Amino acid sequence: MSGPNIEKAKRVTDRCQLYDGRTLPYGNATFDSVGALNVLEHVEEPEAFIAELVRVVKPGGKVVISSPNFFRALGLRDYHPKMRGIGNKWRNWQRLQAKRRQMMADPSSVHFDRMEPISRKPFQPDDDAIVATNSFEIKFFLEQNDCDVLRVECTDRHVAKPIDIALNLGPWRYIMFNAFVVARRKS
């Protein structure tokens, strides 16, 4: 996403290209699968970015999006100020409920909430995040862009199987940890 990083990557492969913030530099239906891992919370137009991910994947191909869940309502030891504290967790819960109602009543008005980046030293993870990503909206925008959502999980890395099942078995997965969503573009 940044010019200097693309230049570094070009030393290894010529397949890296700069994303201009609007259009991914690939043709329609180019890839069998695409993924955005910890990217969505940093782009200026996340709704359009999801549409672009779907555009460049072939029909039947998979889209994987993993981002922090900034609307956590459950959890301890959260790393970002938006996730920390009982007051924020209550506000996050209320905001998610409002968003769910909005998705049903007025889908065209749904947008990810934006955040101001945090400027502090030392830099902390996701201080530069500008989008309050969450599973509900990632799932919603994938479905709006002609995808079937296959999985929504709160774990974005390997955990012991019994713990993984317990964390991702029920609806609480939408209000914990991360937003890990796998979808398939409809044929």
Label the model's feature ranges.
Residues 1-23:
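Class I SAM-dependent methyltransferase SAM/SAH-binding core
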Residues 24-26, 43:
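Helix-loop segment at the mouth of the active site in Rossmann-fold oxidoreductases
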Residues 35:
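A conserved beta-strand element that flanks and buttresses the S-adenosyl-L-methionine
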Residues 38-42:
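Short catalytic micro-motifs in class I SAM-dependent methyltransferases
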Residues 44-52, 62-182:
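S-adenosyl-L-methionine-dependent methyltransferase catalytic module, highlighting the catalytic core
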